[in-house]
Amino acid sequence: MPRSSRGGARGLVVVGDTTDDLGRLGRALAEHLDWPLLAEPTSGARGGPQALVRYAELLGAPAGAELSGRAQRVLVLGRPSLTRSVTALLARSDLPIDVVTATARWTDVAGTAAAVHAVGPGDRDAPGLAAALGLEPAPPSWTAAWHRAVDGLPDPPEGGEALTPDGVALAVYASCDPARAERAPDLVLGSSMTIRRLDRLAPPACGPAPAPIANRGLAGIDGTLATALGAALAQEDGAGVRAVVGDLTFLHDAMSLGRGRHEAEPDLQVVVVDDAGGAIFSTLEYPAVMAPRVFDRYFTAPQGADVAGLARALGARVSRPRTMSELRHVLAGPVRGLSVVHVCAGGCG
């Protein structure tokens, strides 16, 4: 059992990409301590009354800066890597940061962790672990203040029937929520903008949190479809796998959908959010320092490939919904065989 390292009561629980059991522990700790929960989509922790939506956006706003300035401790599980505002929070040297990990080693990117606590299978009891670490519950007003601050953020735009990247990602996420479907498909997320859209907007689950799969780390978008294919071939419950990726992620790994004539067809549906290139770069500094034409050519890099034609050439059935209602109808069906849903979400023609 880890040793205690005393700290204040106004804490935050941050859960990044991790194993399902460690994610559940993070959620249980947040609920036991009444601390706000900042959980990435692949954490397995994104659920319950402590979980915040749009937390990274809040941290970058004045209200979030004021609240995080009042925090007395941060508890980290897994490897948060999706947003700059969370990275900045974990780089603070004035805030005690404790890490709970199931592995013998944990990379402290900012060099600010006060302690790293390795927990074994017998240390997954949240009240016992909290006591061992000297973690004190916060007053209910602490988490309530964070929820009020999130509610005070400007409302995200409503897409209506238009196919927007945010709306498509949320629809796919909802279709794979085990609380909404008796046999929900497993979910694989593209590692560029798709996972970040869901990190910002996916609502916390009321019951067990969805646990999507995503490639993290140096691989970037490479191999995402191979990962989805492997998950589909390994699946045993027959619900299939649904992947949601951008057009560049699809094109980088499209040949993974090919198979030999004697190989089994996977139950895999790939939803391609085609927004004409790499949208993630528009969220960084590059557009402000170069001409739009240069930025579009070298960073957004829209492609001339025929996504639907390529998918058909690889043996996939293709559908192309034109509205959100049509997309939801496609997503309401079971995942059987190999299919690609090509969603034109801006600029793809």
Pin down the residues of each PLM region.
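Active-site diphosphate/adenylate-binding microenvironment
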Residues: 143-238, 339
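Terminal amphipathic helices with adjacent charged low-complexity linkers/tails
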Residues: 97-140
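Glycine-rich, anion-gripping cofactor-binding loops and their flanking helix/strand elements
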Residues: 12-109, 207-237, 251-258, 322
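Conformationally flexible catalytic loops at phosphate/diphosphate-handling active centers
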Residues: 1-6
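Structural motif
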Residues: 10, 73, 186, 240-242, ...
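Thiamine diphosphate
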Residues: 200-349
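Short beta-strand segments
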Residues: 14-16, 76-78, 100-101, 190, ...
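Redox- and metal-dependent alpha/beta enzyme cores, enriched for Fe-S-associated oxidoreductases
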Residues: 15-50, 171, 181-185, 195-201, ...
